[in-house]
């Protein structure tokens, strides 16, 4: 049994479910907060509900819940952990357990933790001793999506085990509707979680200052409650009221991306933006 661990079930449903489908000689268990139980059941042999608040950047009560799950897991089990945030919680949960796991961490982007935000810089300094003490004991492998993240995190954490570069999580191309022709009135879109380090403010300024009549700007995505870089509800309401920009909420990019002509990606500290790969294909 291979255990996939993430702090959000959508992480294990989107691209990772395709990997599970391809590796049909193995059984997979999802360990995450279960929101979309029906989707998880399509792909995973078993799903364990790891309760964690997404409204907190670090939900330390979730450490005890994950620790309980790890205690009930067989010695020598295989774990694949997704995102740096989940990796940190896994390290703490695994501390002093009388078990040895085969664990791999996928860093899909360094995100808020490596941003220029003052609070993030303080967090980074305070948590470094924990990474220095535990990262090599916990993870046999770390997978990165770009060399910049690989160099930065390995230097920060002094990670000495196996470091791998896999550029992008990939997409399943038959799932996407392809674009036949461009619109007469050009549609520009930025799609992703509504985080400040996704370049939302710059995109909004661009839409306000752009004066061509045949261009329309769209923004798609949800708030990421609990992420310190997330827009607030008040900021989102201001965007909704903005005449230069059309807010769409969450959309299914596999079915909807072909309706747009140009995609912007303005992210900082992104591993390899999945939406860029989707746009290049569509």
List each model region and its residues.
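A conserved mid-protein helix/loop that constitutes part of the nucleotide-sugar donor-binding site
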Residues: 11-18, 186, 190, 195-209, ...
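Aromatic "clamp/platform" in nucleotide-sugar-dependent glycosyltransferases that forms part
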Residues: 268
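Short His-centered aromatic/hydrophobic patch
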Residues: 81-89, 107-108
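Glycosyltransferase donor-sugar binding loop
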Residues: 32-37, 171, 191, 216-233
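Nucleotide-activated donor-binding/catalytic signature segment of Leloir-type glycosyltransferases, i.e.
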Residues: 230-251
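Donor nucleotide-sugar binding/catalytic pocket of nucleotide-sugar-dependent glycosyltransferases
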Residues: 49, 132-177
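Acidic anion/phosphate-binding donor-loop and adjacent secondary structure
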Residues: 57-58, 154, 164-186, 196, ...
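Membrane-proximal helix-turn-helix segments that form the acceptor-binding/catalytic region
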Residues: 19, 67, 122-142
């Amino acid at each position: 049994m291979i255990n996939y661990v993430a702090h959000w079930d959508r992480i294990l449903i989107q691209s990772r479910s395709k990997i599970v489908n391809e590796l049909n000689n193995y059984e997979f268990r999802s360990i995450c907060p279960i929101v979309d139980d029906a989707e998880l059941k399509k792909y995973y042999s078993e799903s364990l509900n790891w309760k964690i608040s997404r409204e907190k950047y670090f939900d330390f009560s979730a450490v005890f819940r994950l620790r309980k799950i790890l205690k009930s897991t067989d010695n020598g089990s295989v774990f694949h952990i997704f995102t740096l945030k989940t990796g940190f919680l896994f390290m703490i949960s695994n501390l002093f357990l009388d078990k040895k796991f085969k664990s791999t961490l996928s860093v899909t982007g360094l995100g808020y933790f490596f941003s220029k935000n003052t609070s993030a810089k303080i967090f980074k300094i305070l948590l470094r001793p924990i990474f220095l003490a535990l990262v090599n004991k916990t993870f046999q492998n770390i997978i990165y999506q770009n060399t910049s993240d690989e160099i930065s995190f390995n230097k920060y954490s002094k990670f000495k085990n196996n470091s791998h570069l896999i550029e992008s999580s990939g997409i399943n191309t038959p799932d996407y509707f392809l674009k036949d022709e461009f619109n007469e009135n050009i549609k520009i879109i930025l799609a992703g979680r509504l985080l400040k380090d996704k370049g939302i403010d710059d995109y909004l300024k661009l839409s306000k200052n752009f004066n061509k009549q045949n261009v329309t700007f769209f923004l798609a995505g949800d708030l990421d409650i609990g992420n310190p870089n997330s827009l607030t509800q008040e900021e989102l309401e201001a965007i909704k009221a903005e005449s230069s920009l059309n807010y769409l909420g969450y959309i299914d990019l596999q079915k909807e991306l072909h309706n747009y002509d140009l995609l912007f990606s303005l992210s900082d500290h992104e591993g390899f933006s999945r939406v860029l790969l989707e746009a290049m294909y569509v």
